[in-house]
Amino acid sequence: MTIAVGRAPERGWFDVLDDWLKRDRFVFVGWSGLLLFPCAYLALGGWLTGTTFVTSWYTHGLASSYLEGCNFLTVAVSSPANAFGHSLLFLWGPEAQGDFTRWCQIGGLWTFTALHGAFGLIGFMLRQFEIARLVGIRPYNAIAFSAPIAVFVSVFLMYPLGQSSWFFGPSFGVAGIFRFILFLQGFHNWTLNPFHMMGVAGVLGGALLCAIHGATVENTLFEDGEQANTFRAFEPTQAEETYSMVTANRFWSQIFGIAFSNKRWLHFFMLFVPVTGLWMSAIGIVGLALNLRAYDFVSQELRAAEDPEFETFYTKNILLNEGLRAWMAPQDQPHQNFVFPEEVLPRGNAL
């Protein structure tokens, strides 16, 4: 008998850290967690701090915190003033000079929340990649999650980067987002943009597909147990199918004359529709950042200007956009000292 005596190879700090990060625990950490957890914690903490205590008086001339009397729908972490351009507004930078109160007043929490939020979302996508690799499945969850990341980055970062300052990015709040949507409509005619149309089709189409799929599966469950309801009859480890694809195919073939017969194509289509829609809308927002025009039906505008009896829904919407610009510009750009007399404000032909 031969006995071999040797020393186990020494493990470096990287291997030790890798084992610790990937240890099986209730909440998986992983390498992605080094980015996800700190950034998500700081972004959420910055938003809660701003909405609770910090005013927007110095940046937008508004009250925006619970402390000032706002509610959940009207609080916001507001974007910095236009004068700061695209400065990252570091706490130690020349704007705040280490003064935390001043940093909050000038909008430092917005850049803090936006950047940590973006990296937190990217960390969550990397988390899905990492766990998919460890479990041994394909990474389509992470690929799908790239769509909301693209929308967030395009709206909160790319759009204001294309404009004159962070000021034109949306504030982090419900009413603040609504104001931003109205701004996009008034200054970019966003609802008539084909990329917006594709985004709406993707989101609503995805919701429709989700509802149809869920209802169809519920409709075709096998009666495979004596329990009080169909949910208790399911076992996570059962080998057989829990619903009938053949029956579902027959049903929709009768409804539309055509139906999915391949589960893999069906679920890929459910993935493709909303993800593509969100990506298209993100591309459209980047176009708005560059002030690209979409559809302008100039012939209708010229005819409406010449003929008092000719007006279309398009020309009325153009007038609404002019009204939005006239009312929002003095508020958003007070340093320009805009003054619009009543006679230049838009009025439809019918008025």
Curated annotation (Swiss-Prot):
List of residues binding pheophytin a: 128, 141
Entry binding sites for a plastoquinone: 213, 260
An annotated Gene Ontology molecular function: electron transporter, transferring electrons within the cyclic electron transport pathway of photosynthesis activity
Alphabetical UniProt keywords: Chlorophyll, Chromophore, Electron transport, Iron, Magnesium, Membrane, Metal-binding, Oxidoreductase, Photosynthesis, Photosystem II, Thylakoid, Transmembrane, Transmembrane helix, Transport
Binding site for chlorophyll a PD2: 196
GO cellular component: photosystem II; plasma membrane-derived thylakoid membrane
Compartmental location: Cellular thylakoid membrane
Binding site for Fe cation: 213, 267
Residues binding chlorophyll a ChlzD2, per UniProt: 116
InterPro entries in the cross-refs: D1/D2 (IPR055266), Photo_II_D1/D2_sf (IPR036854), Photo_RC_L/M (IPR000484), Photo_RC_L/M_CS (IPR055265), PSII_PsbD/D2 (IPR005868)
Free-text cofactor note: The D1/D2 heterodimer binds P680, chlorophylls that are the primary electron donor of PSII, and subsequent electron acceptors. It shares a non-heme iron and each subunit binds pheophytin, quinone, additional chlorophylls, carotenoids and lipids. There is also a Cl(-1) ion associated with D1 and D2, which is required for oxygen evolution. The PSII complex binds additional chlorophylls, carotenoids and specific lipids.
Transmembrane portions of the chain: 39-59, 123-139, 151-164, 206-226, 277-293
Broad class of the protein's primary localization: membrane
The reaction(s) this protein catalyses: 2 a plastoquinone + 4 hnu + 2 H2O = 2 a plastoquinol + O2
Keyword field contains Transport: yes
EC number: 1.10.3.9
Any one GO BP annotation for this protein: photosynthetic electron transport in photosystem II
Membrane topology according to the record: Multi-pass membrane protein
Keyword match Oxidoreductase: yes
Record's miscellaneous remark: 2 of the reaction center chlorophylls (ChlD1 and ChlD2) are entirely coordinated by water.
Assembly and binders: PSII is composed of 1 copy each of membrane proteins PsbA, PsbB, PsbC, PsbD, PsbE, PsbF, PsbH, PsbI, PsbJ, PsbK, PsbL, PsbM, PsbT, PsbX, PsbY, PsbZ, Psb30/Ycf12, peripheral proteins PsbO, CyanoQ (PsbQ), PsbU, PsbV and a large number of cofactors. It forms dimeric complexes.
Similarity comment: family membership: Belongs to the reaction center PufL/M/PsbA/D family.
HAMAP family documented for this protein: PSII_PsbD_D2
Function, in words: Photosystem II (PSII) is a light-driven water:plastoquinone oxidoreductase that uses light energy to abstract electrons from H(2)O, generating O(2) and a proton gradient subsequently used for ATP formation. It consists of a core antenna complex that captures photons, and an electron transfer chain that converts photonic excitation into a charge separation. The D1/D2 (PsbA/PsbD) reaction center heterodimer binds P680, the primary electron donor of PSII as well as several subsequent electron acceptors. D2 is needed for assembly of a stable PSII complex.
Protein name in UniProt: Photosystem II D2 protein
Source species of the chain: Crocosphaera subtropica (strain ATCC 51142 / BH68)
